[in-house]
Amino acid sequence: MKPILNKIAIIAGLSLLASCQSFFDEDPVYSTTTDTFFNSETALETYAIGFLESHLPSAATLTRGDQYSDICVTTQTEGFLKTGGYSAQQANNWARGNWRPLYNVNYYLKHMKDAAPYVDDATMKHYEGVGRFWRAWFYWDKVKTFGDVPWYDEPIDPDDDEQLYKGRDPRDYVMQKVLEDLDFAATWCSKASKYVNTNVINRYVALALKSRICLYEGTWRKYHGLDGSEEWLRACVAASEELMGDSPYSLVSTAGEETTNYSKVFKSEEPQYTEVILANEFNATLNRFHDASWYYASGSYGQRNSGPKAFVNMYLNLDGTRFTDKDGSNKTQFKDEFAGRDYRLRQTFITPYYVKKVGGKETNEFAKVFPGLTTQLTYYRIIKWNTDDDANESNTSSANSLPVFRYAEILLNEAEAKAELGEMDQTVWNKTIRPLRERSGVIGAMPATADPYLASYYDGVTDKWILECRRERSIELYMENTRRDDLMRWRMGHKLTVEFAGIHIPELGKPFDMNGDGKNDLCFYSKSHPKSGSNQTGVSYVEVTAEEGDNVTTYSVNKDNCLVYILDREWADYKYLYPVPKNALDINPNLRPQNPGWDD
């Protein structure tokens, strides 16, 4: 909301966010002294709002944090997935700046107590909960990345060599500390009206983070063979059910608007607080913009992010049946494969139904709204974060607010935790998966059997409930910075190397109609299947450099005559954790041993 955005702008404008010289002796997040600053609730609020500005995930993280995953095709891959492309010498995220957020939080938690004579106990506990919320999030991110990490719950004295050069604490110890912080925040952060739907940390936000982290840790432990999985999954259920049972949140779902219910959550400037629990807010009036529309529309600025066919196939039919149960489903033409499908599909990718503003006027004209290969790679062009206006596709001018936590995720967390515990039933289904599907026009009936398509994709997982939870999560939270984490916790890192197939090509060398308007739009051809005759007006011609089996570096065609983008990637199981950077090990040998599989 504007009041919070105004306060953030004021804090930034006054340069209250200090630059830091050293991780261990830096100034706190604000240029102030504790003797005079922490003497009122206003001081606590100001400091807490500063955390929102400095710690909240950025627009880039929220909208494209999942671009290097199995369900997004990019022009290039990251070094981490290249053969020989990543090592301890190249590793990062252990420098002073990476630990600075922890110092700032611990400084705040230590010195905020100076406000106790001026602030009532409930308010003090609320703001302590805010600090512990951010510390929990910080450490969860560090554990996801490195596994064992040193735990610090106070700012470090620069003369304390024992603390400066301590070793890494075990994952279990650190995560128990994280859970303590989460429990405190979820208990003592306030749910008073002045904190709710004002985009600040409150009890519901704390419960949302607890739900997310506990699901991650519970399933990580289950699939990576560690003890304690059930404890974490039950903590996820407890947090999710508290939020589901005692909060003002629900799904954005209006009867008769199934084709737009989903997209409303992502395309509006004012956060959709019916569903959104916390957002990174943007606002045109305050000149607060991001670049998501530009990134996804530009072939040079972005990575030409696109959806792979294997993912598009996961979307159900509106009658609740599986698209992939139909014989030849993988050979369905683009113009036909969206009819009668989950309406989230057309709200996530450009389809023949897509309408956007071009030159200030809304149009569905195919040549104007559908991009060529210069801006995407598979012809499943992502529009989830786009404002559907070409005025925002060549600059940083998007002002749609971006959800950080939303109620839909809580339903998904509850469903998956219950499924992993073996406790999914019709009651749980009807409270979680069913409403998510029904708001986008899909009949929400429970599955009678496990989906063989998903069982094959997820390498033999046969539990029908777990498979449906994974389907729903991948669709509902697509490109919301959750997929990479999901693959890591499910021990499915090898899916990062899946084939990146695109649309089905009816016949090489022959133009075809993409959108069903009776006009040919596109023609793929190759050396062995050349285009026939002269080029047709209005048809884009794309050369496929070879067919399946040939040594190619760009595009191929697979056995189902689907376009395939060639992108070499490599996975090894030691990559479930990143290496501790070599320079950090050299400075502090007590951080050894290095994570398994990585050389120093």
Residue ranges and their predicted role:
Residues 1-18:
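Sec-dependent bacterial lipoprotein signal peptides
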Residues 408-412, 424-453:
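Active/binding-pocket-proximal capping segment
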Residues 41-46, 50-55, 78-146, 162-176, ...:
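Conserved, well-structured interaction surfaces
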